[in-house]
Amino acid sequence: MKTTLLIPVLNEIDGLKAIMPQIKREWVDQILFVDGQSTDGTVDWIKQNGYEYVIQQKKGMRYAYLEAWPHIKGDVVLTFSPDGNSVSDRIPPCIEKMKEGYDMVIVSRYAPGAKSDDDDAITGFGNWMFTSLINLCHGGHYTDAMVIYRAYRKDLIYELGLDLDKHYEVEEKLFHTRVSWEPLLSMRAARKKLRIAEIPGDEPARLGGVRKLQIIRWGSVFMYELIREMFIKNYK
């Protein structure tokens, strides 16, 4: 099993300087950044430290992933936030758990033994609500269905149709935003009864940069997807 650590960035120079020295290159087979056209020196720092990177052309986290996907060498992808929210010491146990034959392993902020120091009342409630609804409506057993910090098979994206624009275009046009695919990945993986595990991992507060959440718009999209997915059977 080969693993690619995929790190999407947009003006995260402070987080990179603090977090990347904690990540040993030998933990994974590839470290790949995808940069959303940062203006704070992020790309220069990535170059100076000898990391692979892709410059994103279309806006939105989903397109960051899609544009990075052809450059991924691993058969397992571990998505990681460099803003301080993802604790680096969970990388090795997440990979070891994947080696047990799981399709996806989530580093959960809300599993027993973990906590989030980044949540406020609104985001904490939203994460709990959507995770609970995904479990109720789609047969999941998650404590954290929304988090970026997770490992999964690279080809899972194609199996679940997450690479296809048609599965996002209605809601993104309706609510004038672009979203990531983690919630939809959680829904479809649960509905397909894939092998899913969670390990606990704290979520520290963000380090520098600007929080990019669009709470109302993203929440509206996720609610739309949650209802729509109850009636979809073909992901191709």
Where are these predicted regions, by residue range?
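Hydrophobic helical membrane-anchoring modules
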Residues: 14, 93, 132, 163, ...
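A conserved acidic beta->alpha catalytic loop
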Residues: 35-43
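The conserved acidic donor/metal-binding loop of glycosyltransferases
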Residues: 81-86
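Short aromatic/hydrophobic "clamp" motif used to bind/position activated sugar donors
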Residues: 77
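Cell-envelope/extracellular polymer assembly enzymes that use nucleotide-activated donors
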Residues: 2-4, 184
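Short, well-formed alpha-helical segments that are part of the catalytic scaffolds
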Residues: 11-25
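Donor nucleotide-sugar binding loop of glycosyltransferases
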Residues: 12-15, 38, 61, 87
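Acceptor/aglycone-binding surface of glycosyltransferases and processive sugar-polymer synthases
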Residues: 57-59, 63-70, 88-172, 206-223
